[in-house]
């Protein structure tokens, strides 16, 4: 199937100025040509979409999404069945694609089945890179303990993300990689939504973080860290992680350290 998108302002994403009257030709699932209408011939068998008055641009990449997080209503969360929450998540994934996001890093909550369902065309959605779990220390940002004395699993289809000490972390990292994670995510600071910690307190030692980095490297994978406070960011950098998520301090401050 061949499709031509015509008449719209075209942003190629190559650093050039927008093209006022652009044409994009798509053959199958590949962009065959893109540029000014005068330079891009339209195949005779193409289905044409008139984009006049609109802007056409490449798909966007969202580097931090949680496709399975919708409601903050804890009572409702506990009343929903896991299957209901999974089916509701497919709506979020479809909405993400409808926003023009064609690739996304899923930062915990979705297992490999979400990624494979999209890849096989079972549900519409962006290409996903998944972390599966957000690994956390006891009492950390990913430990969903509440003062009533219970642990509330945010996603009943996933195992507990809590691990303490190098060997527990090593084992849990091995598990998420076995389960199909594209990268590993751990928490090196608290978070603004946590019940039992503060966003700026450090979590995990450098040694513990480095174990995660080394284990992921054995599989050719990287480590992303949830890090909001300065101390947690410094520890993550010392352990040579691959990305800092949130990073609520200035770049100048970090560079000075």
Positions of PLM-derived features:
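Metal-associated gating/positioning segment near the N- to mid-region
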Residues: 54-120, 138-144, 207, 239
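Active-site mouth loops of central-metabolism enzymes
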Residues: 75-86, 153-170
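Divalent metal-dependent hydrolysis catalytic cores, especially in the metallo-beta-lactamase
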Residues: 87-114, 125-134, 181-194, 222, ...
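Short, acidic/polar
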Residues: 86-92, 165-175, 229
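Divalent metal-coordination and catalytic microenvironments
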Residues: 8, 29, 53, 64, ...
């Amino acid at each position: 199937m061949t499709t031509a998108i015509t008449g719209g302002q075209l942003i190629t994403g190559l650093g050039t100025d927008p093209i006022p009257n652009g044409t994009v030709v798509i053959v199958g699932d590949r962009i065959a040509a893109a540029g000014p209408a005068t330079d891009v011939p339209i195949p005779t068998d193409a289905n044409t979409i008139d984009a006049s008055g609109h802007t056409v641009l490449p798909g966007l990449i969202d580097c931090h999404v949680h496709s399975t997080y919708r409601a903050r209503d804890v009572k409702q969360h506990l009343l929903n069945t896991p299957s209901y929450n999974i089916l509701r998540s497919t709506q979020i994934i479809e909405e993400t694609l409808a926003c023009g996001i064609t690739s996304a890093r899923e930062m915990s909550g979705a297992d490999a089945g979400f990624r494979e369902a999209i890849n096989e065309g079972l549900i519409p959605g962006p290409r996903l890179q998944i972390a599966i779990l957000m690994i956390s220390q006891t009492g950390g940002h990913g430990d969903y303990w509440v003062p009533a004395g219970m642990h509330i699993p945010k996603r009943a289809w996933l195992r507990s993300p809590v691990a303490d000490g190098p060997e527990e972390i090593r084992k849990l990292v091995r598990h998420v990689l076995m389960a199909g994670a594209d990268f590993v995510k751990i928490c090196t600071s608290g978070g603004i939504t946590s019940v039992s910690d503060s966003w700026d307190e450090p979590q995990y030692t450098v040694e513990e973080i480095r174990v995660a980095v080394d284990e992921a490297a054995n599989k050719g994978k990287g480590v992303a860290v949830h890090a909001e406070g300065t101390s947690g960011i410094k520890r993550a950098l010392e352990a040579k992680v691959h990305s800092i998520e949130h990073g609520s301090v200035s770049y100048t401050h970090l560079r000075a350290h």
